[in-house]
């Protein structure tokens, strides 16, 4: 996987790059739409939603985006709306000898690919382009109204002795033929690390959630296709970094194509 390292900009320039959303702007809160789409066996398959939050430890408005994600997950259910915080770009922080950094080279690659111009910024099921955080609630509502074309199940087998996890991603076609890429990521919750706050202060004990750690497979996934009624299993192995807390690590798997994310699933490794 090609890794691209980007030079971090100065703090002053970074601050001016962070999007500033007026607090007076209100979220659009809506009822949950129906998302049921039974397969041939009568099993109800729900299309889940992926929020890719392009964030950074030096972004003063990014904690606001984290709060909005929490509200969305409270409204729709954290099992139905899966968030991944991709620390990246000029406002991302790769760390020092004394301070924990959460930005990754792969995250920077995604940041550049999507042409992110401000942070916080996000993708909701990769439909509708780059959105500021005040637009996420409506985008989630719109995405939730669509039917699932496949189901995804994740089976994780973690070995404490060598800190490796065997990941089985099981997919089943529900309707039509789905072609695209199967992407598998590792994320971690409850990481305590520095974060710039909306009031300009620095919180050294900020708790970061759903932090993108690495791509288990290629940065852009593996080629994937599935027909209605077809079942497939893809198996991967990941060795955890020594600094990761296994109890807080989850696997996120999703299938995407030119029409966006078709299905997504998340499961903790322990």
Each model region followed by its residue ranges:
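Membrane engagement elements in two modes
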Residues: 25-33, 37, 64, 71, ...
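Short, conserved sequence motifs used for protein processing/export or organelle targeting and
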Residues: 85-270
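Intrinsically disordered, low-complexity segments enriched in glycine/proline and serine/threonine
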Residues: 5-6, 55, 266
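Local sequence-structure signature of Cys/Sec-based thiol-disulfide redox active-site neighborhoods
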Residues: 40-88
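Intrinsically disordered, low-complexity boundary segments flanking structured domains
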Residues: 35-39, 69-74, 110, 137-142
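Bacterial Sec-dependent N-terminal signal peptides
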Residues: 1-50
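Alpha-helix termination/capping residues and helix-transition junctions
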Residues: 12, 75-78, 116
């Amino acid at each position: 996987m090609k890794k691209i390292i980007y030079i971090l900009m100065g703090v002053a320039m970074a601050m001016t790059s962070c999007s500033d959303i007026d607090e007076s702007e209100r979220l659009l809160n809506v009822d949950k739409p129906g998302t049921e789409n039974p397969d041939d066996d009568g099993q109800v398959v729900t299309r889940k939603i992926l929020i890719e939050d392009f964030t950074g430890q030096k972004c003063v408005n990014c904690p606001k985006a984290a709060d909005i994600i929490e509200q969305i997950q409270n409204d729709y259910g954290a099992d139905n709306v899966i968030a991944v915080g991709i620390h990246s770009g000029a406002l991302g922080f790769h760390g020092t000898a004394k301070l924990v950094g959460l930005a990754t080279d792969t995250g920077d690659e995604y940041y550049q690919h999507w042409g992110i111009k401000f942070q916080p910024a996000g993708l909701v099921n990769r439909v509708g382009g780059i959105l500021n955080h005040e637009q996420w609630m409506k985008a989630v509502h719109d995405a939730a109204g669509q039917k699932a074309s496949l189901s995804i199940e994740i089976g994780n087998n973690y070995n404490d002795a060598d800190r490796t996890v065997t990941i089985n991603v099981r997919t089943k076609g529900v309707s039509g033929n789905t072609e695209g890429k199967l992407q598998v990521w590792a994320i971690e919750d409850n990481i305590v690390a520095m974060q710039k706050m909306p009031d300009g202060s620095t919180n050294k004990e900020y708790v970061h959630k759903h932090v993108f750690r690495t791509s288990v497979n290629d940065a852009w996934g593996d080629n994937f296709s599935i027909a209605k009624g077809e079942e497939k299993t893809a198996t991967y192995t990941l060795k955890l970094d020594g600094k990761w807390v296994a109890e807080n690590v989850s696997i996120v798997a999703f299938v995407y194509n030119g029409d966006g994310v078709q299905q997504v699933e998340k499961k903790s490794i322990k």
